Amino acid sequence: MKDIKEDLFKAQEHISNAIEHINEIEKLKEKPNVPFPTNSIPRDDLNVAICVGHSRKGDTGAVSCGGINEWTYNKKVAEYLKSDLQEYGISSFVVDDYGGTYGSYTSAMNWLIKHLKKEKASIAIELHFNASSNSKANGMEMLYWNASRIGLSLAEYLLRGCQKYFPLIRNRGTKSRKSGDRGATFLRGTHCPACIAEPFFGTNFEPDWTTFANNEHVLSQAFATGIKQWSDEHIIL
């Protein structure tokens, strides 16, 4: 009898998860519910900065269940994304080697902020994957600066693109950041709207890592779709 009850509980859990995933897929049919920004970016000026997280000297980021670090994984995503955006007629450039003092996060961010302005980036995305000491932590989320309305809209569309391509991955939503929070220096400091992409937990084997391992190009297509839809439907004149 005990085994039967355990099997029933597991079956109920699987059914609940399936219903949750179906609801997430249904939400994709709707446009993200975000306020319309007060300013827009002309299409001809759209220049996407694709920043590979942990590109500062002496840093490669967290390591996934498969032994691949953040920088190595996202370097591939960045190169694919640049090509995918080009197919959409959207200009972009990759930043995968931050300047600054060795080992200094602040110095690297100061260099990156100046570099993005010099390259006339109109939006900036920094690519990461999440990590946790709790191997069960999973799902995708996008971070934006709490006072940036365009940053919020960009985060929503990137999340929407990822949900379209990876519908079975938990949606943790968009998350605002304020001073002192993780990622705040990048999100606040850039002259343009910015977003930090955390599409999965590299420290979660199932479902996150098994879904995203060797799928760098699928992930880049998800990001490109989000950027394209954002530019078509929400911001660009």
Where does each model-flagged region fall?
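Mature extracellular/periplasmic domains of secretome proteins
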Residues: 105-121, 184-190
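Solvent-exposed loop/turn segments at secondary-structure junctions
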Residues: 54-57, 98-102, 129-134, 147-150, ...
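Active-site-adjacent mobile loop/cap segments within catalytic or ligand-binding domains
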Residues: 46-49, 124-126, 175-237
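Generic L/I/V-rich hydrophobic alpha-helical segments across diverse proteins
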Residues: 8, 15, 22-25, 29
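Active-site histidine-acidic residue metal-binding/catalytic motifs
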Residues: 24-111
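Second-shell loop/turn segments in exported
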Residues: 62-72, 97-102, 140-149, 205-214
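A short, glycine/acidic-enriched catalytic loop
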Residues: 57-69, 130-162
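Extracytoplasmic/secreted envelope proteins and their assembly/folding machinery
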Residues: 75-78, 82, 109, 113, ...
